[in-house]
A protein has these predicted regions:
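Bacterial Sec-dependent N-terminal signal peptides
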Residues: 1-11
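Active-site-adjacent "subsite" loops/lids of carbohydrate-active enzymes
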Residues: 10-33, 111-189, 245-246
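Hydrophobic faces of well-ordered beta-strands that scaffold small-molecule active sites
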Residues: 16-20, 51-53, 109-111, 194-197, ...
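Short, acidic/polar
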Residues: 26-44, 173-185, 302-324, 348, ...
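Catalytic domains of carbohydrate-active enzymes, especially glycoside hydrolases
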Residues: 34-61, 189-193, 318-331, 393-400
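Aromatic-lined carbohydrate-binding/catalytic grooves of carbohydrate-active enzymes
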Residues: 48-90
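Polysaccharide-binding and catalytic clefts of secreted carbohydrate-active enzymes
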Residues: 144-325, 332-335
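Substrate-binding cleft of secreted/luminal carbohydrate-active enzymes
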Residues: 312-430
Length: 430
């Protein structure tokens, strides 16, 4: 039988997405198709329209067929009182299974990848996983940090304060080609959307990336000759800018934003060449005022942060805004449970209001909360806050998303989401 035509938007309202983190949900879905099917039915029944399936966690290995990336074989999982390795026992195509089961219940499917990552250093003496740790010949792909004691590869940072994802250098052409191929492989699937997460510089922020590759590219970009690297740009160990950034620093920040801008443009074009119907988008933190430290300008190029008083922005920083290369955008409105309403950053409503202002109609966007890790959310018990969280975000943007499914399940927030979506749908004109 032919599938029923989709209801027009005025009957279904704006899209409502739930994020399904690969690592956090691994134990439930790595080898249980029935559980995937049952949970997707429940997701649909409470009123979500879309799922976002993470298929490349921070180790950089993948849960779909790729010509260049290795299949994900294990993740570190918190069990009882410590982290343990859990190995994948399922042999089915994880992403294809989500697509198949979602189609049966009428959910749209978006796949997300962690973009500029290539490995993960685990706490509790578990060791590490990922391409960068397995292939020593690719150490030059990893970020180089401008640390207090000198330049150092993130692969040489092994202290307890350095646990977590190992980032790749976004300016490295080999890295870009590798990640682009992963994205092209993903675009071969029957997806509604592809979303880039962590399409940015390292978690070390302003300390990244000071490799020889980045130095050479910066000199080419800026016309500045760096004779005393990295001090030409920043003193060793710099983690924050003073109130007045110098011209070279501003040019450096512009350069980093141009690196990410050009990659997003390239990735968007690559996806649309393979399948023009796949929507291309990104996840970013909605805290624009400080997101420059990640090398990202997610705004419209029509928005000028310099004219808006941001002291770190050069005259050309606005040209690195990449909103016009995206079909949709997810803004992490990750405010605390008691910071739902407001007009500024670090309120959910304020994040979304600012998003609309900065994106200038270039792209549809939606904001949403992190209901497991943000202030006030970490211990559950916040079901009463969910309907307002939905209302604050969905009315200011073009949809709503929530991170993460595992928290809905852990804290049994299903009924709260159903109430929030039902309340919203009552306001939609029939």
């Amino acid at each position: 039988p032919k599938p029923e035509p989709e209801k027009p938007a005025e009957e279904t309202g704006k899209p409502r997405y739930v994020w399904i983190d690969a690592a956090a949900n691994f134990c439930d879905y790595e080898n249980d198709k029935d559980r995937i099917a049952a949970d997707l039915k429940r997701i649909k029944d409470v009123g979500f329209t879309d799922i976002i399936v993470d298929v490349r966690p921070t180790s950089g290995d993948v849960l779909f067929k790729s010509s260049v990336a290795s299949p994900l074989k294990k993740v570190d999982v918190w069990k009882g009182s410590s982290y343990v390795w859990v190995s994948r026992t399922g042999t089915y195509d994880y992403l294809q299974t989500f697509i198949d089961e979602a189609r049966k219940v009428g959910l749209k499917v978006n796949a997300s990848i962690n973009t500029f990552v290539g490995g993960y250093l685990c706490p509790y003496g578990l060791g590490s996983d990922g391409m960068l740790f397995r292939e020593s010949g690719r150490k030059s792909w990893a970020s180089v940090i401008n640390a207090k004691d000198g330049l150092v590869s993130v692969m040489d940072l092994t202290g307890s304060e350095d646990y977590g994802a190992r980032f790749l250098n976004p300016a490295n052409e080999q890295v870009r080609n590798y990640v682009l191929q992963i994205i092209k492989d993903l675009a071969a699937y029957d997806l509604d959307g592809i979303i880039l997460d962590r399409c940015r510089y390292d978690d070390y922020g302003l300390q990244s990336d000071f490799s020889d590759v980045s130095k050479r590219k910066f000199e080419e970009y800026s016309g500045i000759t760096c004779s005393s690297w990295p001090g030409d740009v920043m003193a060793p160990g710099t983690t924050a800018l003073g109130s007045k950034a110098g011209e070279t620093v501003k040019k450096w920040l512009e350069f980093r934003a141009s690196v990410i801008h050009d990659f997003v443009a390239e990735a968007s074009d690559a996806v649309h060449r393979i399948n023009k119907d796949i929507r291309f988008g990104v996840y970013v933190g909605a805290w624009y005022s400080t997101y420059y430290t990640s090398g990202v300008n997610w705004a419209s190029p029509k928005y000028d942060p310099k004219a808006d008083g941001y002291s770190w922005a050069s005259a050309n920083y606005k040209n690195c805004g990449y909103a016009d290369h995206c079909d949709f955008m997810f803004l992490g409105a990750y405010a605390g449970a008691d910071s739902i309403w407001g007009s500024g950053e670090w309120t959910m409503q304020g994040f979304c209001k600012q998003g609309r202002s900065l994106l200038k109609g270039d792209v549809k966007f939606c904001g949403g909360p992190d209901i497991g890790n943000s202030t006030g959310w970490t211990n559950g018990g916040q079901a009463s806050k969910i309907p307002d969280s939905i209302k604050a975000c969905i009315n200011e943007g073009d949809g709503f998303f929530v991170f993460d499914l595992c928290h809905i399940k852990m804290y049994d927030y299903w009924d709260a989401f159903k109430k929030g979506f039902d309340d919203y749908l009552k306001t939609v004109k029939k």
